[in-house]
Structure formats: C-alpha cells, structure tokens
Amino acid sequence: FAHMFPLGTDKQYIQDMIFDVQKDIILDLARKSSCIIVGRCSDFLLQNEPNVLNIFIYAPYKARLENCVNKLEMSEEDAKRTIMKVDKARSAYHKRYAGYSPADPLHKHLMIDSSLLGVEGTADLIAEIVRQKFH
C-alpha cells in the first residue's frame, strides 16, 4: 500500500525512486554531451561509459572544520556536528546505491586533497588533467 500511495511512511522507497530518476538523468546527460556531475554515485552509474574521469576531492578534517567556521560562519560545535552528519549521510547513500564507500580509490581515477592548492588551484589542476586526457 505504501508503495502505491507514499504518504511519508516509506521514506526509503521515495529515496529509491529519486535515485532511479537521478540515474536516468545522469546517464542521459553523460551520453548526450560533455558534462561535470558531482556526487550522486556518478562514479558507479558511469562505470561502463566511455570517456569518464572519476575524481574524488577531499580535505583533511581540520581544513574542513576551518572552512565551516571561517567561510560558512558556523560555530565550531555546529561545524563538527555538520561535518559528522554530512559525512555519515554521504557514506550511507553511496554504500546503499553503489555498494562501496564514496572514497574508495578502486573506483576513482584521481583523488585530490583540496587543502594543498585551495579551491581555485584544485579547479585549475582538474581542468589541466581534463585537457590532457580528452583533447
């Protein structure tokens, strides 16, 4: 009954439906033209597609905490809670739909610590790698 008339009682069913729609959109976009897809298990969804570059961008906990406090103007306690909550949710989502951790290097072509070069430097590095790989 809940599957036919979801009224908020079957949250996972709704999340599964959303994932299926996102999957169709991601595959459609990737097959039509060049694009950048952030998250949404795109490494898993596009694993059999040609001309894909799977990049995992991360930063050490301390850098993430400082970013939340300084750039997002969060208290340190709120930042800690938010980081923990977001990490847990991302990991659970990716493990549910892809079957592995989002940080699993076996499913990435490249992993970059963004604290080394900053946001702009990391973007420049990725742009150069894309130019060399696809042009």
Please state what every model-predicted region is.
Residues 1-34:
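ATP-dependent small-molecule kinase phosphotransfer cores
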Residues 48-70, 76-86:
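Conserved phosphate-donor/acceptor-positioning beta-strand/loop module used by diverse small-molecule
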Residues 23, 119-127:
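Short, amphipathic alpha-helical "lid/cap" segments that border enzyme active or binding sites
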Residues 29, 42-48:
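RNA pseudouridine synthases
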Residues 42-43, 59-64, 116-118:
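Conserved nucleotide-binding/hydrolysis micro-motifs of P-loop NTPases
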Residues 1, 75-120:
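Small-molecule kinase domains that catalyze NTP-dependent phosphoryl transfer to phosphate-bearing small molecules
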Residues 128-135:
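Short, charged, intrinsically disordered terminal tails
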